[in-house]
Amino acid sequence: LPVWCPLALALIYAGCRTVPPVAHPLAPLTANEIRRAVRILKDSGRVPPGARFSLVALDEPPKELVLRQVVIPRRAFAVVYDDAANKTWEALADLDAGRVDRWKEIPRAQPPVSAEDSGLADGIVRNDRRWQQSLRARGVDAGSVIVVAWSAGYFALPGAGEGRIVRAIPYLGVGRNFYAHPIEGLVAHVNLTTGKIIDLLDTGRNVPVPRESGELALPATGPPRLAPAPLDILQPRGPGFQIEDGEVRWQKWRFRYGLHPREGLVLYTVGYEDGGRVRPILYRAALSEMMVPYGDPGGGWFFRNSFDAGELGLGVNAVSLKPGVDCPANCAVFDAVFAGGNGEPVTIPHAVALYERDGGIAWKHDDETRRARDLVLSFVATVGNYDYGFDWIFHQDGALEMRVALTGVMAAKAVAEGTHEGFSHRVAKNLAAPHHQHFFTFRLDLDVDGAMPNRVVEMNSVAVPPGAQNPYGGAFTMEETPLLTERQAQRNLDLASSRKWIVINPNVMNALGHPTGYALLPGENALLLAQPDSWVRKRAGFLNSQVWVTPYRSAEIYAGGDYPNQSPGGDGLVKWTAENRPIDNHDVVLWYSMGITHNPRPEDWPVMPVHAAGFKLVPWGFFARNPALDLP
């Protein structure tokens, strides 16, 4: 072959290396692509000196082009923030053409709080005389203090309307778990733009700093118990899944995934092999937003209602997973790469795990039994004091499950011995953990047997009134109600009726003549306890309902809006659905919020045992019979 290798020959001879392989349109950006995107933007002369890259990620191409397998130029989406001017820009860089396709300032937008912000806040408070005096009054050496920057929220407070704002919270830096040593009643409301403290809370000088160890490693945890008997997980012939050009194939499932800097794990083009073809189920599924509101009204706590995805980022806070510890020994692990604030790629080794595990009994009757196997796609994000594990679990019976595992260190406050108040619970000497909630909102772009048309049906089990149709009092029926508009589709759970929702394709019938579908089966949940007129609820309006349905729009990704940091609310789902658009026989997106109310207990300290919650998407008339019937 000639060394120049014509394109036609390159398509025939896979060994020709002069033509790079074409990335799948949904493949995450590589380190080289991140570098190229940043270079394109900087070379355009638009990026101010010293500006930081808050986000650089794949600009996902139009869904219809991806599904048609059209060759699409690779583009990067970037968020650029200039600290000096307090300005935010969105940019699109065409990686193939080497040009800037978009550069737009976004007024009043504040990107997520980052490590750079913590460093700035730390420097500002340490140089403030009031802060120094407050520490001395508590007998605390400023050199032993660790400052953590919290997102400030929004409460229409004086002086907080302009600039980039955070709350600076101090801890005594004793050991690795400094969260066990809060310096109570000292919180600085910091304007990072002006370099000044807006307001300084200085109460609780009479509250001692907790000194009891909160360390999580030996010998602080005490003598270890007798180790359990060895349990080895072996796959002598290797894993049962294959990955071809970024697509995972396992037990009739097919899907792609990426680790997004903000959303964390994203599933793409999920389908199931049936009858010699791959039937589509989901186009895209990911966590859209998180919100963690605290119930303590005190000055050092009322503002703590973090939007962990939109204000901090989940993917960028992913941690490296250790096989045999964070995931089973038989797991395959994969790196993730993101852009640092300076635009240089940062690699997180072993950020994602993929593994098979025993799934218990798949089905059984009498002496006929089949054992199940699960495939788990997993990552863990450490967001400040809390750790969140996210598992997408693929079952052989066609069910897809999301499991969120909550662990880590609770946010605790210092209290004087012998005192008690109703907004927290004592967990250790001089320590109480305020009551709080965790909410997770997922965006599920279901394409059941295709994107168009889909319909969402609500199902309620209803008791039949006593009478001729219910002579013995035990009869109940199932009512199905199509949801036709966005307003009608703002729904909540109902235990009394075992409420569930099904996305069906009215144009595709199963063997029994019914539309094929997939149902959302909720798990543990809770209602937001913040008052209707509170800023907490105004900013998290997407939690007013546990289920929303919208017509598919590629730009409608984040339930709380694109920039929730310092936002007064009103964006995202609340804004989009105000139009009350029709959703029947459309390409629809199902939004589901689940919540956990955490009333702390001593057993949650100094580290919280895993508390898991989740939901399932299960086939509902999608197959002719139990799809796991063919298990060997």
Short names for language-model regions:
Residues L95, K104-V113, G175-L265, T269-A399, ...:
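Extended effector regions of multi-domain proteins
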Residues P25-L65, S114-A156:
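Short, non-transmembrane alpha-helical segments in secretory-pathway proteins
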